[in-house]
Amino acid sequence: MNLRPFCLLLGFVLLGTNPVLAGYTYKEDDTRLVNGVLYDINGDPVTGTYEVFYENNIRKSLMPYVNGILNGVGSLYNEKGVKEADMPFVDGKAEGIALVYYEDGRLKEKIPYRNGKINGVMRTFFENGNVKERISYDADVRSGPAKSYYEDGSLKEVYAYADGKKEGAATVYFYDGSVAEELRYSGDIIVGERNVYYKSGNLKSRILYEFGRKNGNMQNYYEDGKLAAVIPYKDDKIEGEGAFYKEDGTLDLTVNYKDSIRDGAAKAYYPDGKVKLAANYQNDLKNGTETEYFESGAVKTEMPYVDGIVNGVGREYYETSGLKMEMTYVDAVANGTAKFYDQDGKLSAEANYKDGKKDGTQKDYDKNGRLVAESNYVKDVLDGEYKEFYEDGKVKSTASYANGILEGLTLVYDTAGNLSYEIPYVNNRKEGKVKRYYPGGELMGEVTYEKGKKHGMLDAYNKDGTLMAKVLFNKDEAIKGYSLNHGKDPVLMSEEELKLINEAY
């Protein structure tokens, strides 16, 4: 260190007529250490205090010397200048209790020294003052009983050392004092059976260790004592088929492992033991076809996996018949054409998907394969023209959707292709004049809708355009109506006639 020499005269003792320095504070550059004896620049053994500083001139240590030998209590400091430890020395060797501190000055460790080595019980402390750990030492080597504690002071663990290594039985405790674990050490490694417990005292897991490594079947238990899992270990890694059970004791899962990751067959089960789901793993990722089953054993779904992601054509089946649906997936998202089938195996619908949502044309078919409806979707929502068809392919109706809502004019046709109705929609409700036509195109009748309900006068016409009837509506209810003979001779309608008129519009 490049430090300026600095001496502080603490006092002196006169021996005869020669003044001899009895106490100084020495800097590092003022001294030299030879065979364990500290000498000053004049070659005299140091008696006084010896200081060492960090490069920023913050004190690093302050050590007491008598005749060049450490004697008394020395102190160590961190780079902030805060004391870290007090070390007692006798004749150049640590002797007594060394104290180590937290930065705020609270006690962190008490270390017993004898003849320069740790001897006795070393204690470490939490910042709240409670003991954290007690470890027995013999000539710097851990030997004998040891204990660790929770921050509230309750016992956490009891174990022992021999020749510096953990040896023999060890017990770990919960905060409340109940046993959490029981295990054994040999030469600092776990050997034999290791048992883990619930707070109730019931066994939670059991595993055998060989040379510090898990070997054999680890058995996990529910708190009521029922088996939860059997997991095979070899050289500290899961190897082979693990089995996992439900709380009622029935088998839930079996999974094959290699080097502690899933590799090979994995299955889920119904309560009666039949396979519910079967998949295959490679390097912890699903690969190949994942098959789901009904309880009857029939295939329910088939999903293709590549490196843990669904890619390809997925299929869903009816329990008692055949294919129900086919869907193409790209990176676990539906993309492309999806096909849907009825229980007779006939195509019932096909739709296009993009980014997991319906997007584009959907077509619906009857049992004979004839087109019955055609619609358009944008991001899973009806949007655009919607058409229905008769069996012969003629248009039955047309409608318009905007963001899933009926908007605009819906047209309905008869089997001959003639316009039968014009129905205006606003925000999914009939709004405006609904018109009905004869097959020849003549107006048969018209009525006004307000907020989805018939309101006002309905006029019905003969083919020649003369009035056939007039009916007054109020909020979808026919109040009164008259039949007319080509616009003449009104006759009050019966309740039954009003009902028929209401149904027709």
Label every PLM stretch briefly:
Residues 1-7:
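Bacterial N-terminal signal peptides that target proteins for export
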Residues 18-505:
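Glycine/tyrosine- and acidic-biased, solvent-exposed loop/turn segments at the edges of beta-strands
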